[in-house]
Regions:
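Ferredoxin-reductase
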Residues: 2-92, 97, 113
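FNR/FR-type flavoprotein reductase catalytic core
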Residues: 82-142
Length: 142
């Protein structure tokens, strides 16, 4: 079972009319714990109306960005997604578990390959992380 850490929200930005991007401040002493590979996700935990809620969200930035960001699409009647899109703001605190997941991309700098990714809807978020990683770390790939 993952250990959760309290992280402060750095910024909540409206990405579309139905989605926000949440950026977290990661204290320096937790940098190693929150290091991730492109394609991984984090689990967010909070209490809403007295009930503990956990949701997994893919990271949507490259590991080299030194940022921890997730995109959350508002889902009708989605308890956490509605909360995130309407109430969360900078300086709020959420409990966050370290990155997990096996849908990862490991770049090879000297490789030249053609990479194609398909995704729809909010499934684009891990692909965004992978695309950014390819562009930053595999300069010979397309």
């Amino acid at each position: 079972m993952s250990q959760f850490h309290e992280l402060t929200i750095k910024k909540v930005s409206k990405d579309t009319d139905k989605a926000v991007i949440i950026s977290f401040n990661v204290p320096q002493n937790l940098d190693e714990i929150f290091a991730f590979k492109a394609g991984q996700y984090i689990t967010l935990k909070t209490k809403i109306a007295g009930k503990e809620i956990r949701r997994d969200y893919s990271l949507c930035v490259s590991p080299k960005s030194n940022e921890l960001k997730v995109a959350i699409k508002k889902v009708e009647n989605g308890l956490f997604s509605v909360y995130a899109n309407t109430l969360l703001k900078a300086n709020d605190v959420l409990e966050v578990a370290p990155p997990k997941g096996r849908f990862v991309f490991e770049p090879i700098k000297s490789t030249a390959r053609i990479i194609v990714g398909f995704a729809t809807g909010s499934g684009i978020t891990p692909i965004m992380s992978i695309i950014k990683t390819v562009l930053e770390e595999e300069p010979l790939s397309k």
